[in-house]
């Protein structure tokens, strides 16, 4: 199971799951040992396949940092916090977490789009 390290110590993912919003974006930063990279990619693919079949899932994309160290960023869009919460707390998904390499550290955080005048829309 990956160690969970919050991006925001004062407002970790467990607290964010209690806020109703939508759509939401999950940003999950992963770090791990280089030798665990193949195992990480295999289990992430299985997890993403599971999430893709859940109600409220819109899309996901995995990114790898440039350079030698395996640092990954997962960006997933969900219709709502409640849809993500239901998928994340699903016992079948929770059981899969044990398969992650011991070196894996995950930093999940939920975001919502905002509008900035003349730049982007929410």
Where in this protein do the model-derived segments appear?
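A broadly tuned preference for mixed-charge, low-complexity surface segments
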Residues: 78-91, 95, 114-122
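Glycine-rich beta-strand-turn "strand-cap" elements at beta-sheet edges
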Residues: 1-24, 61-71, 96-122
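Intrinsic-disorder/low-complexity regions
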Residues: 7-9, 27, 35, 46, ...
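Short, well-ordered beta-strand segments in beta-rich or mixed alpha/beta enzyme
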Residues: 23-31, 61-90
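Short amphipathic alpha-helical segments
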Residues: 34-59, 92-100
């Amino acid at each position: 199971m990956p160690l969970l390290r919050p991006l925001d110590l004062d407002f970790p993912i467990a607290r964010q799951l209690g806020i109703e919003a939508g759509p939401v974006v999950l940003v999950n930063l992963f770090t791990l040992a280089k030798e665990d990279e193949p195992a990480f990619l295999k289990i992430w693919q299985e997890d993403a396949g599971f999430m893709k079949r859940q109600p409220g899932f819109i899309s996901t994309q995995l990114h790898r940092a440039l350079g030698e160290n395996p640092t990954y960023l997962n960006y997933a869009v969900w219709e709502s916090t409640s849809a993500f919460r239901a998928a994340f707390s699903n016992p079948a998904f929770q059981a899969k977490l044990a398969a992650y390499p011991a070196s894996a550290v995950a930093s999940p955080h939920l975001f919502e789009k905002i509008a900035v005048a003349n730049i982007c829309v929410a």
